[in-house]
């Protein structure tokens, strides 16, 4: 099993797919990496040579921000928005959707489970 930037890549998948297991690398970026390093995208992870693994590792570390570094940067950006008090920061602080989605209905993932409020009793 090849290990790149702290992630074990699945052995039986094509390299194009296996690289997407790294946080910060999607399909397009994985294709760019393989093209830049000259590795066939249809090659399986288990068929990689040690030289190819080293080549991939060096390219990713030199050119991309992935895994822990990327997560830290995203968290720092969110913290900065909260500190400066911009609208997006307020939405983050309140645990509401940040990008303009509706909240009258939906947004349950962000808001959490419903908190039922007792309504009026029926008049007789």
From Swiss-Prot:
**Any Pfam family hit:** Ribosomal_S13
Keywords from the named record: Ribonucleoprotein, Ribosomal protein, RNA-binding, rRNA-binding, tRNA-binding
PANTHER family named among the record's database cross-references: 30S RIBOSOMAL PROTEIN S13/40S RIBOSOMAL PROTEIN S18, SMALL RIBOSOMAL SUBUNIT PROTEIN US13M
Gene encoding the protein? rpsM
Q: Enumerate the InterPro entries for this protein.
A: Rbsml_uS13_C, Ribosomal_uS13, Ribosomal_uS13-like_H2TH, Ribosomal_uS13_bac-type, Ribosomal_uS13_CS
Q: Cellular component per GO?
A: cytosol; small ribosomal subunit
Q: What does this protein do?
A: Located at the top of the head of the 30S subunit, it contacts several helices of the 16S rRNA. In the 70S ribosome it contacts the 23S rRNA (bridge B1a) and protein L5 of the 50S subunit (bridge B1b), connecting the 2 subunits; these bridges are implicated in subunit movement. Contacts the tRNAs in the A and P-sites.
Start and end residues of each stretch annotated as Disordered: 95-124
What is the annotated quaternary arrangement, including any partners? Part of the 30S ribosomal subunit. Forms a loose heterodimer with protein S19. Forms two bridges to the 50S subunit in the 70S ribosome.
User: What does the sequence similarity comment in the record state about its family?
Assistant: Belongs to the universal ribosomal protein uS13 family.
Q: Which GO terms describe its biological process?
A: translation
Q: Report the protein name in the record.
A: Small ribosomal subunit protein uS13
Q: A GO molecular-function term, please? A: tRNA binding
């Amino acid at each position: 099993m090849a290990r790149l930037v702290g992630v074990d890549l699945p052995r039986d998948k094509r390299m194009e797919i296996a690289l997407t297991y790294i946080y910060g690398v999607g399909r397009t970026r994985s294709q760019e990496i393989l093209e830049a390093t000259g590795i066939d995208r249809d090659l399986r992870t288990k068929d990689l040579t040690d030289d190819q693994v080293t080549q991939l590792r060096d390219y990713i570390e030199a050119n991309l921000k992935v895994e822990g570094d990327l997560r830290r940067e995203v968290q720092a950006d969110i913290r900065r928005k909260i500190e400066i008090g911009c609208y997006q920061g307020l939405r983050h602080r309140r645990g509401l959707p940040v990008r303009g989605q509706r909240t009258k209905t939906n947004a349950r993932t962000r808001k959490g489970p419903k908190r039922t409020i007792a309504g009026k009793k029926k008049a007789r």
